[in-house]
Regions:
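Transmembrane-helix boundary motif in ABC transporter permease subunits
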Residues: 101-131
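Generic hydrophobic transmembrane alpha-helix motif, especially the helices
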Residues: 132-168, 175-176
């Protein structure tokens, strides 16, 4: 075979070998494209366009309810310059720290307490009346007491998040562990596992879906509780942005705070829902 023929053959092989790679890349890109929530994107875009159109037409008074453009400008200004002592991301960071600490504490206490209530009848009988009483007190009702006892501090804000987040964790862990198939626990004990070992290695893993569901609800409750607490007892955070903007009659800054409260909550729920679906894939795709 001549050098020219060999070179042509090599070029053909290279072209043929690159075709599957190109097809795979195209298929992967198409899959990502199809997975995008186009209906949600279209709905959000439609709402924004209608909102802007109503503002431009005068149907909505921009001085009372700002347009999307005004809200965007207020957001950019808050990112670039401090608002009430912090930039926008400084306020977001303050809220996230309180939220994470409170929810983490609620998860640790909730799993321990809920598992104990499901596993030990004596403990359940002693603690259930108190728990049932306390869980019906709204988290915001604790704010004045928390400020008096703990002062306007990080501890008070974390406590409010904890109060709002811990009940769903306890309830879901309790019902999940109590609902584990008795055959599984009996088999473990027959093989020599003690009560604590059976709880840790059999009952809690079997209640994974309930636990993750409780955590997902706790995260949402904790976020809502925190924002409420920041409205009355904080010097930073997204809730503090809203109440400060209200005193200065700045509706665009209020909407900026509300926008990021909703965005952070929604994105967190998407992450938790995806994590739950992947960790409990055997339950199907309805999660």
């Amino acid at each position: 075979m001549t050098p020219i023929v060999e070179r042509v053959s090599e070029d053909r092989v290279g072209v043929l070998s690159s075709q599957p790679s190109t097809k795979r890349s195209y298929s992967r890109g198409l899959l990502v494209w199809n997975r995008l929530p186009w209906r949600s994107i279209a709905t959000i875009a439609s709402v924004l366009m209608a909102w802007e159109a109503l503002s431009l037409s005068g149907a909505i008074d921009p001085s009372r309810f700002p347009s999307p453009e005004q809200t965007f400008r207020a957001t950019v200004a808050m990112i670039e310059r401090p608002f009430a002592g912090h930039t926008l991301f400084g306020h977001i960071g303050a809220s996230l720290v309180r939220w994470i600490l409170g929810v983490a504490l609620a998860i640790a206490v909730g799993i321990t307490f809920g598992a104990a209530m499901a596993w030990n009848l004596t403990f359940r009988a002693a603690t259930r009346p108190i728990f049932e009483f306390l869980r019906y007190i709204p988290p915001l009702a604790w704010v004045p007491l928390a400020i008096i006892v703990l002062g306007p501090s990080l501890s008070a804000e974390v406590f409010i998040v904890f109060v709002g987040a811990v009940p769903p964790v306890i309830i879901n862990v309790w019902t999940g562990v109590a609902g584990v198939d008795p055959v599984l626990t009996s088999a473990a004990k027959t093989l020599g596992a003690g009560s604590l070992r059976t709880l840790l290695l059999i009952a809690l893993p079997a209640a994974t879906l309930n636990i993750l569901t409780g955590i997902r609800v706790a995260v949402a409750n904790g976020w809502a509780s925190l924002i409420g607490a920041e409205l009355v007892g904080a010097q930073s955070g997204l809730g503090f942005i809203i109440i400060t903007a209200q005193t200065s009659n700045r509706a665009d800054d209020i909407l900026t705070g509300m926008l990021f409260i909703g965005l952070i909550g929604a994105l967190t729920d998407v992450v938790l829902r995806t994590t739950t679906r992947r960790l409990t894939f055997w339950y199907g795709s309805s999660l």
